[in-house]
Amino acid sequence: MKYVDASAVLRLLFSEPGGSVPLVRGDHLVSSELVEIETFRAVDRERLQGRLDDAQTARKRKELIDLLAMLDLAAIDRFVIDRAKGSFGVNVRALDAIHVATAEMLAGEAAGERLEFWTHDDRQATAALSRGLTVRGV
């Protein structure tokens, strides 16, 4: 199971250098519902900053819809909220805490399947490592 945060999804979407999540047929890709908001906001930010024109934005939004359809998205439920508001032992931003807490929940439900936390965000990687998750991508 591969948990992908917004930075990993965006690297796939924009084909950025520096590697991304290696996708293999049959991979179980998961994330938080939060990833939808973060990634659509990022595409809109690219448009507003003049890096995407209207046609490019429409294509990227369609590609993003297709990419997100490959993910099983977990709800931000009471477990996630309680874990995210708890102490991490390292400095953690709110959205990063939600991603890490969601990954912890999914790892606990994985029924023997190993979870890898994919991110290209150093601070989020540190937060995930502080909670014992296996981190890839940074």
Task: Describe the predicted segments one by one.
Residues 25, 67, 73, 79-81, ...:
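Alpha-helical scaffold domains
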